[in-house]
Design a protein with these regions (language model features):
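Acidic, surface-exposed loops and disordered segments
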Residues: 2-5, 9-186
Length: 186
């Protein structure tokens, strides 16, 4: 057997690099925190594009990709949102807020669409973290006023807002329940 290959046509170095990247993903999952206080620094357009690209690659049932995004960057719109959102300070001070909507016409099953949008949101949070940014997912926002401010279409339903920016500080990790409390094996 060829020493450059590892059981097939995949060079061993590529397998090692893949394992290294996987460790980066696992590290990002463990280190990511919800950031609620931001520095005023703007987000570079290429970083924002990378975050949206990561969101686009989330899994969805039947590949329906039911998510749509409205990127709120203007101070005026952030102030307007801040007047109607409970977490107003985060929305006002984060340089970017991404509204994540469900396109009701694109999906095939509401529950599966919402699950897919959850995966999409996790991609946004992890991508932001990996780029040195912080983010926080704001739920409980099914508010017609918010949908009007962001210009949601008739077939779109607001699922969440995600505020993104450079963290003013990185909070310490919160305790997690042990797997023994969360997992049953049968």
């Amino acid at each position: 057997p060829n020493p450059e290959n590892s059981g097939g046509n995949i060079p061993a170095i590529m397998i090692a690099r893949k394992e290294e990247r996987m460790n980066e993903v696992l590290r990002a999952i463990r280190e990511r925190r919800s950031i609620r206080v931001f520095r005023p620094d703007p987000i570079e357009p290429e970083k924002l594009e990378a975050i949206l690209e990561a969101a686009r690659w989330a899994p969805s049932g039947r590949n329906t990709q039911p998510w749509r995004f409205v990127v709120v960057e203007s101070q005026e719109k952030r102030e307007e949102l801040g007047r109607v959102v409970t977490q107003m300070d985060m929305v006002r001070t984060a340089p970017v807020t991404i509204a994540v909507l469900r396109d009701k016409d694109a999906g095939y099953d509401e529950t599966k669409d919402i699950q897919a949008i959850g995966a999409c949101a996790q991609n946004i949070l992890l991508a932001a973290h990996s780029l040195g940014l912080g983010a926080c997912w704001l739920g409980r926002l099914r508010d017609p006023q918010v949908e009007k401010i962001i210009g949601a279409k008739e077939n779109e339903e607001l699922m969440m807002l995600i505020v993104i920016g450079y963290p003013r500080e990185r909070p310490a990790p919160k305790e997690r329940k042990p797997l023994s409390e969360l997992v049953r094996r049968i």
